[in-house]
């Protein structure tokens, strides 16, 4: 960016660069350019599909059958959707497994008959609390006043003055 070109910062006087000797008319034009609304960038979905390079022109797709030919695309979408939901189910299952077992610390892997690995789930102790557990009063929650001890010999004078 050219530091001599006026910008909103140089016009307002907050620029670290020295002001140039632009005319007032040039500054007004520059201000008007900055005040005009910006043009919205085109979105990907608004753009036309890209054209293939001239060297790699592919043959035109085969004509669609009488039914519209959407059956194959719908089947492919259905398969993708089914795989997606299967993946979601696996993620939920793993999350529940981690929640129940308390990470990988709680599981032991041992080999059993047939060479198959089986997980013995050794549950971690996870205490459950209910509001009744906290219903009792804590000793630290009250202001404790020291008890006054009653002397065993109440009239004993310990002063040494005579």
UniProtKB/Swiss-Prot annotation:
The keyword Iron-sulfur does not apply. Residues 69-80 have a biased composition (Basic and acidic residues). Disulfide bonds: none annotated. Keywords: Nucleus, Plant defense. Residues 1-80 are annotated as: Disordered. Residues 37-46 have a biased composition (Basic residues). InterPro entries: NPR1/NH1-interacting (IPR031425). Interacts with NPR1/NH1. Interacts with NPR3/NH3. Binds to and represses NPR1/NH1-mediated transcriptional activation of LG2 in vitro. Belongs to the NPR1-interactor family. This is NRR repressor homolog 3. It comes from Oryza sativa subsp. japonica.
């Amino acid at each position: 960016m050219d530091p001599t070109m006026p910008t909103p910062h140089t016009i307002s006087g907050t620029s670290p660069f020295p002001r140039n000797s632009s005319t007032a008319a040039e500054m007004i034009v520059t201000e008007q350019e900055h005040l005009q609304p910006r043009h919205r960038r085109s979105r990907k979905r608004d753009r036309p599909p890209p054209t293939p390079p001239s060297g790699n022109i592919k043959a035109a797709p085969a004509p669609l059958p009488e039914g519209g030919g959407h059956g194959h695309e719908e089947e492919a979408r259905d398969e993708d959707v089914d795989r997606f939901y299967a993946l979601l189910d696996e993620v939920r299952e793993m999350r529940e497994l981690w929640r129940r077992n308390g990470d990988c610390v709680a599981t032991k892997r041992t080999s059993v008959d047939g060479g198959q690995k089986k997980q013995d789930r050794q549950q971690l102790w996870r205490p459950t609390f209910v509001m009744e557990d906290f219903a009792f009063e804590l000793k630290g929650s009250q202001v404790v006043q020291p008890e006054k001890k009653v002397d065993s010999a109440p009239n004993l004078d310990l002063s040494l003055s005579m």
